[in-house]
Amino acid sequence: MRKLKFIFLNIFIFSILPIQAEIPIVAYFGIPLEYSNVNRFKEFKEAGFDVSICFYDDTPVDTLLRILDDAQKSNIRLIISSGWVSVQPHVGIPRLKNHPALYGYFLQDEPWPKDISETKRRYQAMAKQDTKKPTYVNLLPNYGDGMPREIKMPPYKQYLQQTSAIGLPFISFDFYPIMKSGIRNTWYSCLEDIRQESLRTNKPFWAFALCTPHCDYPQPTIESLRLQIYSNLAYGAQAIEYFTYWTPKPTDEWDFHDAPISINGHRTRNYKLVKQMNQELRDLLPLFDKAEVLTVNHMVKIPEGTTKLQRIPTNIKKLKITGRQGAIISTFKKYGHLYMAIVNKDYLSDMELNISAKKNVTMITKQLKETTAKSKYKIGGGDILIFKLK
């Protein structure tokens, strides 16, 4: 009888969540035109990606349709950047929009404040041709890299409100926090602003992780990827984007190298790394898909623009963090249950957690199994620990 009860419990745990989440794992700068074929899309899928943002310039629409056919064979969907989409949407979009492998259309990356009105005009022209599939615009981070000095960046909240007026279906922004000198000190304040704008507009947000080293950005590790991705999820991100999958051509300003796939089409050491991260992430995503994030607080080190945890969550009696950078404490609802996610903000060292909770509190593994909560945990660099509170 005990065995039967145990089997029933496991079945129940797995049945409360969907088998596959709708949170996509996206690659910015996916497979280039000359490599866009069935085998490359299969390789892309094996790395754990769902959506490729592809830049095809003025490639004929017939060729784009062939590429979409190839992507469909590996269950990959594309966000397409092409002049036939963004410059002549009345020509390209009607022919592309019904293809099942088309996720959406790329319009612009990091629009400057002075460009927002023109971006809105172009967005409306594209959306007029397809009211169902999204048009993608990715926003600047709050540090505004790449903007000429003569162009003044407004307060970030104001910039977000200006871009929201475009009418985009979701908020996508990039922020690459981990540098050779340490973590950018405005990262979490940027996430706070993005989350608040998402709540204000009732639009989901997409967030990035950097896996392509260049300039002052170091070689990624599993710990640095975890920190970026799990911080994004703790704040409520509904898509995880990677910059990049394919190595972009280096420039005098940006010395890109060692993306998961090299500029010549060979796998680098980061292909295996990203694949490992995505395999881990895939199991967790159903829990965060469309979850309602209630609170996001910080413990130990309180970054600029964030809130210190003042009151421990429901059904938790004691919560103590021992670690250099401290933790994010996020509470969220999913299917009527209350959860708490704890993220170690230090990707270079472990963090200790001492916790006392009521008997009904359980720990959720990364495979979404409920286990008995313990009183002590060691959370690896950048890693996440999740509890079901009620």
State the predicted function of each range.
Residues 7-15:
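Bacterial N-terminal signal peptides
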Residues 1-5:
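Positively charged n-region of N-terminal signal peptides that target proteins for export
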Residues 20-357, 369-390:
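Glycan-processing catalytic domains of CAZymes
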